[in-house]
Amino acid sequence: MDIERGIRVAVDTGKVILGSNKAIQAIKLGNGELAIMAENTPKNVKADIEAYSKLSEMPVYTFEGSSVELGSICGKPFTVSVLIIQEPGDSNILEIKE
């Protein structure tokens, strides 16, 4: 499966949350099916995401690229360190959590 294409389709057709602060809130509340982090996510944010995702039993995928690349894949003119897939839409992105 092409991860980049899956992310883009999920952003375009599904429901996603972009940004580390909103992502952490969503994970705490259990709002989402999959968390995706950029490889260069700051250590403190990465630690928070991993800790809260264990508590809420949400799988976390580390994207093998920078936050600049992740932002570009999402079609955004800014960096994206973390995104939460709430609804995948037409994407098969949730297959990576298996």
UniProtKB/Swiss-Prot annotation:
Keywords: Ribonucleoprotein, Ribosomal protein. HAMAP family: Ribosomal_eL30. Pfam families: Ribosomal_L7Ae (PF01248). The lineage of its organism: Archaea, Methanobacteriati, Methanobacteriota, Methanomada group, Methanobacteria. It comes from Methanosphaera stadtmanae (strain ATCC 43021 / DSM 3091 / JCM 11832 / MCB-3). One of its GO terms (cellular component) is cytosolic large ribosomal subunit. Belongs to the eukaryotic ribosomal protein eL30 family. The keyword Ribosomal protein applies. This is Large ribosomal subunit protein eL30. InterPro entries: Ribosomal_eL30, Ribosomal_eL30-like, Ribosomal_eL30-like_sf, Ribosomal_eL30_CS, Ribosomal_eL8/eL30/eS12/Gad45. One of its GO terms (molecular function) is structural constituent of ribosome. One of its GO terms (biological process) is translation.
